[in-house]
Amino acid sequence: MERAGICHSDGFDLAYRIEGEGAPILVIGSAVYYPRLFSSDIKQKYQWVFVDHRGFAKPKRELRAEDSRLDAVLADIERMRTFLQLEDVTILGHSGHAFMALEYARTYPKQVRKVALFNTAPDNSEERQRKSESFFMETASLERKKRFEKDIENLPQDIDKDPERRFVHMCIRAEAKSFYQERPHAAALWDGVFTNMPIIDELWGNTFARIDLLQRLADVRMPVYIGLGRYDYLVAPVSLWDAVDGLYPHVDKVIFEKSGHQPMLEEPEAFDQSFRKWLDQ
């Protein structure tokens, strides 16, 4: 099997990158962005398969309305899994990709051994986003709030200059909400990442707003790991997930106390220890 390449799926060139050996972990999102988040140590312990979905892939044809449907994305993931001859995978979704990961496990349960969901809220509704914003304003330090206000002021001009990368610009300008500690070079994580904005807009803006992960967890029987950052103000507060405690015995919830939206990058040792323990169970 090639360690990197392209899988052609329904008019999209989906990139993949494979690192390490062992039990397969299928990481949904960008094959450029996500390998940068995880430590070299944990990437040696398992077979990490980083794959694009069509929101991060250049289309080979004109976009159609159905290209933004979640079931089309799930079909891409299944096509990639078949193409790479992967079996019995742990499927991993971070942030909005957690919705994709759990939906894939619900749709293709025979192909999934475990599910890992990181740094997401149970839904992406406007009401939940307002709660997250209120939590930030009520609990964040004055220094953090000032830094966010300063950074976000530059977002409109970033988008004016490069509207097709507005998703990336929003992620970069929200750094004060994303990281426990300031990371001056965090923008480099997004270097070379293509964004297919019509698809991202539909999924993040509409589809994920209608999905309640707390309810969908009842539909899967395989083990689920939910990893959260205490200072992840993008999807705060972590108490949004309190309902899983005692309700779902197949779900393990872990809160990383000195992390924001990327605990695998911010607390690599604690992350690796916790995640490896769960993977090896």
Swiss-Prot record:
Broad EC category: hydrolase
Residue ranges of domain AB hydrolase-1 in the record: 30-268
GO CC annotations on file: membrane
InterPro entries in alphabetical order: AB_hydrolase_1, AB_hydrolase_fold, AB_hydrolase_sf
Keyword terms of this UniProt record: Hydrolase
Pfam families: Abhydrolase_1 (PF00561)
One MF term in the entry's GO annotations: hydrolase activity
Coiled coil: none
Active-site residues (renumbered): S95 (nucleophile), D232, H261 (proton donor)
EC number: 3.-.-.-
Protein family membership: Belongs to the AB hydrolase superfamily.
Name of the molecule in the record: AB hydrolase superfamily protein YclE
Protein source organism: Bacillus subtilis (strain 168)
Gene designation: yclE
